[in-house]
Regions:
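N-terminal signal-anchor transmembrane alpha helix
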Residues: 47-69, 224-236
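Alpha-helical transmembrane segments
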Residues: 24-34, 131-132, 192-195, 306-308, ...
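Interfacial helix-loop-helix junctions of multi-pass membrane proteins
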Residues: 2-11, 61-74, 155-181, 235-247, ...
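Membrane-interface helix-loop-helix junctions at transmembrane boundaries of multi-pass membrane enzymes
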Residues: 132-151, 307-322
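Membrane-interface loop-to-helix entry segments
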Residues: 11-20, 111-129, 174-187, 287-305, ...
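A juxtamembrane structural motif centered on a specific transmembrane helix
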Residues: 190-214, 218, 358-377
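Transmembrane alpha-helices
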Residues: 1-39
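Extracytosolic (periplasmic/ER-lumenal) interhelical loops and adjacent juxtamembrane/interface segments
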Residues: 2-3, 70-114, 242-285
Length: 377
């Protein structure tokens, strides 16, 4: 990016918002047709599930954007060289591509980055509709339906947009990129929490609630461990530390390779450098990778224990789903190491972690809304 290109150029904002509105309209119209005549509560319930699905797609596309090195495909925000689409910026993109054919700015990377922004704008529009609909229902006399979860979700998606901008303008600063990933997973969790709520749902009380208390504690602990592991995985990816260990279970021929933990986990520093401006050492990258690998063993054990608890409480399909995701994570994680970080495996690894978080949140809600009867010993 040349010095004449501003980091922020708000000229194309209206056009980008219009494109986002068109993306918002498509699933909204589809849901309207599906729930025709069933009332606004049913509309919001179905729309929340659709928004959850599209947000999951957005997380996957964000992973592709990062893994294809397209994050700086348009080096300003919210547009591309001050234009709403890469078509209008084709001359600037071509000049940058001629200067660095394999650099961060190419026509393909510009389109990937802008498509990610368009989809994010569309998802933001859907969340705005959900928030407005929740408040409208409250004003129409539906006190059982919370307005604060949709309101907080709208606030959070705005925070996500800000982190998306900083990801570009701070040139893929690892801490910002990792926080952006975590924010996307948290957004999924918020939507999953709301997707299972209906106007007439009520928490389980009495003996049934007490019976499921241990399972809810286990779900919370497993979710916390998974959250830490996703953060570590994001740190591996954003620091490009995947390939420093290309064997399993050993790393560089050792079960405890040479590592520089303090340098590897110095959080506030630019990509590839320490806060002092020195190049990040190979030992630091090794520490980043190996900590994620070691944490994975603990997370796998926790998820297997959680699957057993789910089965013990007659949530058989939930247990099978969790086991399937654990297997997916193991296979894709190993593929990333021994096959040289193939794109499909890397994207599926991100998707598997996000799906696991959604499953845990949905299972938590299930224990609150339906009584659980443990299998007799």
């Amino acid at each position: 990016m040349g010095p004449e290109t501003p980091l922020y150029h708000f000229g194309p904002t209206a056009q980008i918002l219009l494109l986002g509105a068109l993306i918002t309209a498509a699933p909204l119209l589809w849901v309207l047709r599906r729930v025709q005549g069933r009332g606004p509560a049913a509309l919001l319930h179905r729309l929340t599930w659709v928004t959850l699905f599209l947000t999951f797609d957005l997380v996957l596309f964000g992973a592709y954007t990062r893994l294809s090195d397209s994050g700086l495909g348009c080096p300003d925000w919210p547009g591309c060289y001050g234009q709403a689409t890469p078509i209008g910026a084709s001359a600037q993109i071509q000049a940058a591509q001629d200067l660095m054919p394999t650099g961060p700015v190419t026509h393909g990377k510009a389109w990937v980055e802008m498509l990610h922004r368009y989809l994010a704008t569309g998802v933001g529009g859907l969340i705005l509709v959900l928030c407005a609909g929740a408040w409208w229902l409250r004003l129409q006399g539906h006190p059982k339906r919370s307005v604060w979860w949709p309101t907080f979700t709208l606030f959070w998606v705005c925070i996500q947009g800000a982190f998306g901008a900083l990801t570009v303008t701070m040139k893929l600063f690892p801490a910002i990129v990792t926080l952006h990933l975590l924010g996307g997973v948290f957004l999924l969790a918020l939507l999953a929490w709301q997707a299972t709520q209906t106007a007439d749902a009520a928490p389980v009380s009495g003996v049934a609630a007490h019976t499921g208390k241990g399972l809810r504690i286990a779900l919370a602990l497993a979710g916390g461990l998974l959250w830490v592991q996703i953060a570590l995985g994001g740190w591996v990816s954003t620091n490009y530390a995947v390939l420093v260990c290309d064997t399993f279970p050993q790393c560089q021929g050792s079960y405890w390779p040479d590592m520089a933990f303090a340098q590897g986990f110095e959080l506030w520093r630019p990509l590839g450098h320490t806060s002092w401006g020195e190049l990040l050492s190979f030992q630091a990258l090794t520490a980043i990778h190996y900590v994620h690998r070691l944490m994975a063993y603990g997370v796998i054990a926790a998820m297997l224990a959680l699957a057993w608890l789910l089965r013990h409480h007659r949530m058989h399909r939930w247990a099978l789903g969790l086991l399937a995701l654990v297997c997916l994570q193991c296979l894709t994680g190993l593929s990333n190491v021994v096959l040289g970080w193939p794109m499909p495996a890397a994207i599926l690894h991100t998707g598997g972690a996000a799906a696991m978080m959604v499953l845990i949140v949905l299972a938590w809600q299930r224990t609150r809304s339906q009584p659980l009867t443990p299998i007799a010993a």
